[in-house]
Amino acid sequence: MLILTLAGCGAGTAAPTQPEITPAPSAELTEEPLESTASAVTSEPVQTGLFAEQIFSGADGDIHYSYYLPDSYDGSRKFPMMVVMPGYNMMWFGEDSSGSNLNWSGFTAWTRLDTEMVVVSAQLTDWGEKSARQAIELTEYFINRFAVDASRVYAAGYSAGGETMSRTVAMRPDLYAAYLHGASQWDGSYAPIAENSVAIYIYMADGDEYYGSAKARSAYENLHEAYENAGWSDTDIDKVLRIETPDNAFFNEKGIYNYHGGANVVFDDPDNLNWVLSHSKG
C-alpha cells in the first residue's frame, strides 16, 4: 500500500505556503471499483488501474483515500504494497481538496516501477496520533481485503505525512518492512523500529526551510542508537538505515530553490524507491 505526504506542518505551527512538485499522473482513472478487486480469485474480470477518491468509514471517522492496482492484478498472486501519505497541501480540507494527492510524484512514482505493486494514499485531517491510527487501519484493511504480500508492506510519508507515518511505523512496526521518511520530523518512538528490523530511509534537503535538516540527522542518530541497543553491528545497521541531506547546489542544478518542497525529487530516482522495496519481513 502506499501512503503520501507533502508540505509539512507540526502541531501549533502555521502550514507552509510553498507548493509541492507534482508531475502528471501515470495511471488511468477507474471509477466505481468492483468487489472483484478482493484477494480471492473470481471468474469475473478484475478492474485495475487508479481508483480515486474512495471513502473508508473507520473507528476514528471517514478516511479519504485513493489506490492503484497493477494491470496484472487478478487475485491469483500476492503483490507488495506501498502506503504513502502526502504533506499538508494535499490533506483533507473538504470536497474541494478531494483527490489533490493524485498528481503527486510520491504516489505516482511507485506505479511506474518495474516491481508491480498496490499503492495506497490517503488524505488525512491531522498529523498526530489520530492520523497514525487511521493509517494503520487503512493498511490492515488492504492487507485483509486485497492480495497483498504481508512480508512486503511499505510506508512513505512527506512533511506532515512524515510526522504521521513516523508514528505509524513505530506504533505498528510489525506491519511494515521499510519506511521512506521525506522532509519531515520524526514523531514516533525509536526502539520498536530496531526491535522489529524496520528499514528506514531518511531524505531531507540540507537547506530545508521548514523543519531544518538537524531534525533529519537527529532522527538518524536516535534510530542508529536504537539499532545498537538491539545488538546490531554498524555494518548491519548500514544495510537498514540510510540518510541523505543533499546540499543547496544539488537542488539548484535542477532549477529548484524551494528546498522543503524540492525534496520531492527523492521520488524521481527509481534507485531510491527500489532500496525501500529491497527489504522484506522474515
Label the predicted regions.
Residues 9-79, 163, 168, 229-241:
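A domain-start/cap signature at the N-terminus of enzymes
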Residues 72-77, 127-159:
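Gly/Ser-rich "nucleophile elbow"/oxyanion-hole loop immediately N-terminal to the catalytic nucleophile
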Residues 81, 85-136:
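Active-site machinery of serine-nucleophile hydrolases
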Residues 97-98, 212-229:
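Short alpha-helix in the alpha/beta-hydrolase fold that links the catalytic acid
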Residues 115, 194-200:
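Short, proline-enriched alpha-helix->beta-strand connector loops that line the catalytic pocket
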Residues 144-145, 151-194:
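Primarily recognizes the serine-hydrolase "nucleophile elbow" in alpha/beta-hydrolase
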Residues 203, 207-209, 228-282:
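C-terminal catalytic histidine-bearing segment of alpha/beta-hydrolase fold enzymes
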